[in-house]
A protein has these predicted regions:
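Conserved N-terminal beta1-alpha1 strand-loop-helix module at the mouth
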Residues: 1-72, 76-78, 84
Length: 86
């Protein structure tokens, strides 16, 4: 089975989850994502407000990252805050 480059790109989440990521790096990530035609961009919750103008891309984030050892209540609170942020 062959898959086209465009079809493959639409299966990718273009991700930047570095704790030291800058707004400029998030902007570059978004520009790359648009150019590549990926499915979504994934950023840390604190960077979600920088993704407000992404009509053509989906936005993803993480909860309990990176360990996943947070309690369910903590993850739920993170998810609610992320939803509020964008």
């Amino acid at each position: 089975m062959e898959i086209s480059r465009d079809a493959l790109a639409r299966m990718i989440d273009h991700t930047l989850l570095r704790t030291d990521a800058t707004p400029a790096q998030v902007s570059a990530l978004v520009a790359e994502a648009r150019e590549l035609g990926v499915f979504s961009v994934c950023v840390s919750p604190s960077m979600l407000p920088l993704t407000d103008d992404l009509a053509s891309l989906k936005v993803a984030t993480v909860c309990g990252f990176p360990s996943g050892n947070h309690t369910p209540a903590t993850k739920a609170a993170e998810a609610a805050e992320s939803s509020r942020l964008g």
